[in-house]
């Protein structure tokens, strides 16, 4: 625990919260040359306990040097990071110790947390997602309590002075790059004190920390061999990874359609034509083919216009069977030339010119099975923030919330792992689709994307929702939106749902997908 000029009551409470723990521990305190007599008094009293060791720096060195001093002195197999004015829950170390005993190969562990004010009132519980490496790149979500295998913390170089202010984020990025197992304890075991001027109370309180975090993420990308640039997100302490995709990579876009028209923003449009127009006009990735799988009722003038727009980049595939969205997607995949596939509903419109780069590039990274985008309704509200499966609900995170809503703990602003993705905009590879057997044709209209997502996740692959990649989805203007009970029962009988979604445990509004 690094200490510097801590208010007496807060320091005493922090130390007491450790001393009351029932598990075996040592508390290593490093005082960074505090001048306060109260700090010296509290530490002198604390070190009377044989479980407490206090080191005193002669010269103030800052949080990174102080933390490294503490790490160098640690005797335990694991180190837990505690700020000098925060609190551990009474059962904290006992729960941590039990978890470490259950999984001997744990190298990094984190818990849920809340905030506590000067009056001792607890609020703002952060029920965190399970291990989400993409979210960690975009947000230091694991926070407190973080428990790291001591040997690994030292092996990666400890705390980096270049990351002053975001040194924990930098360290956790380095540790998790090598960790054999990362475990989340879904229990509030840490209380983050919110005082004026602290990041707990105001995320913009330390702008230098945001910049340090941005640089830490960039170094992480370089170590991981991820071709891209870390940029600032929409709010302080959020980041975006802008990935690079080799222009030579061919992408096949598969669009099932019946060729209908609909009113959008007061004007009637041919939906599939305007989607293709937006792709060809806006996409900055040019090596594409567009496979349109159409039913016989599709008007000939629509087919003619698609051919005129796309020329050799358009492939029209006739589908003569009864309506089956899943079958049409599978037919489109078989007709496509590329290894990398992007499935789009015909009632979409591109907003982000780099949508193909940002959806396809992650598929080259180990363990990524599919990606999806941020989808908006015509009125700008959020339509898709990833799938959430919990307690019998099959939902879209953030469905219908304002488009500028940051979501619970900024979940709608940062890219992250999720339990599933809508097939309205889903990127994957031919290899993955063949591995899982494609779309389930027993589900012709609804929940086929839920089934596909569960199959992909069942192969141990991750699904990423890419927050900075946006398209409009004029949902169901081209088909009957009705959900049949038998469809729901089919997918529930096959897969069920957990009680709590591992990637989105709180803050969603239950709505059928």
Placement of each model-derived feature along the sequence:
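Short, acidic, metal-binding catalytic loop of nucleotide-sugar glycosyltransferases
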Residues: 16-25, 272-287
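A conserved acidic beta->alpha catalytic loop
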Residues: 31-40, 59, 293-303, 349
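Glycine-rich, basic loop-to-helix element that forms the pyrophosphate-binding segment
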Residues: 57-74, 319-336
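A recurrent flexible, glycine/aromatic-enriched loop bordering the glycosyltransferase active site
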Residues: 64, 72, 123-147, 151, ...
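Short aromatic/hydrophobic "clamp" motif used to bind/position activated sugar donors
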Residues: 79, 341
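Conserved donor NDP-sugar-binding/catalytic core segment of glycosyltransferases
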Residues: 91-123, 348-393
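C-terminal, non-catalytic tails of nucleotide-sugar-dependent glycosyltransferases
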Residues: 142, 206-248, 379, 391-418, ...
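Donor nucleotide-sugar recognition loop
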Residues: 157-173, 208, 349, 415-465, ...
């Amino acid at each position: 625990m690094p200490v510097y000029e801590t208010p007496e009551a807060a320091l005493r409470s922090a130390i007491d919260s450790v001393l009351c723990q029932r598990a075996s521990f040592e508390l290593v305190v490093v005082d960074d040359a505090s001048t306060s007599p109260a700090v010296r008094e509290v530490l002198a009293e604390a070190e009377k306990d044989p479980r407490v060791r206090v080191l005193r720096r002669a010269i103030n060195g800052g949080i990174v040097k102080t933390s490294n001093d503490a790490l160098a002195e640690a005797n335990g197999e694991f180190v837990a990071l505690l700020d000098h004015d925060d609190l551990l829950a009474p059962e904290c170390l006992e729960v941590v110790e039990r978890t470490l005993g259950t999984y001997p190969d744990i190298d990094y562990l984190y818990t849920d947390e809340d905030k506590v004010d000067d009056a001792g009132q607890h609020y703002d519980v952060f029920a965190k997602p399970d291990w989400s490496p993409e979210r960690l790149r975009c947000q230091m979500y694991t926070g407190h309590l973080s428990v790291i295998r001591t040997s690994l913390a030292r092996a990666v170089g400890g705390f980096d002075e270049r990351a002053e202010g975001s040194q924990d984020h930098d360290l956790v990025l380095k540790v998790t790059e090598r960790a054999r197992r990362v475990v989340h304890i879904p229990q509030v075991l840490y209380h983050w004190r919110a005082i004026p001027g602290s990041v707990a109370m105001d995320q913009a309180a330390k702008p230098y920390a945001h910049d340090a975090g941005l640089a830490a993420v960039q170094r992480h990308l370089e170590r991981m061999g991820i071709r891209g640039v870390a940029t600032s997100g929409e709010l302080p302490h959020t980041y975006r990874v802008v990935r690079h995709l080799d222009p030579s990579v061919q992408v096949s876009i598969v669009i099932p359609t019946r060729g209908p028209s609909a009113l959008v923003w007061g004007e009637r449009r041919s939906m599939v034509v305007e989607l293709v127009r937006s792709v060809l006009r806006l996409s900055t990735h040019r090596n594409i083919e567009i496979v349109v799988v159409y039913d016989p009722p599709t008007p000939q003038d629509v087919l003619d216009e698609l051919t005129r727009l796309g020329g050799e980049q358009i492939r029209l595939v006739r589908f003569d069977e009864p309506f089956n969205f899943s079958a049409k997607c599978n037919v489109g995949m078989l007709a496509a030339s590329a290894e990398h596939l992007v499935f789009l509903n015909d009632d979409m419109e591109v907003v982000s010119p780099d949508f193909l780069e940002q959806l396809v590039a992650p598929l080259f990274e180990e363990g990524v099975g599919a990606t999806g985008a941020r989808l908006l309704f015509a009125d700008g509200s959020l339509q898709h923030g990833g799938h959430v499966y919990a307690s019998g609900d099959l939902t879209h995170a953030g469905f219908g919330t304002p488009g500028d809503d940051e979501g619970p703990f900024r979940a709608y602003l940062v890219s992250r792992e999720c339990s599933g993705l809508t097939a309205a905009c889903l990127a994957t590879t031919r290899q993955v689709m063949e591995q899982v057997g494609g779309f389930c044709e027993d589900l012709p209209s609804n929940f086929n994307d839920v089934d596909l997502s569960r199959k992909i996740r069942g192969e141990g692959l991750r699904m990423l929702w890419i927050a900075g990649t946006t398209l409009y989805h004029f949902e169901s203007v081209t088909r009957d939106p009705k959900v049949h009970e038998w469809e729901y029962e089919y997918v529930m009988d096959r897969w069920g749902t957990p009680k709590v979604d591992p990637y989105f445990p709180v803050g969603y509004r239950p709505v059928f997908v």
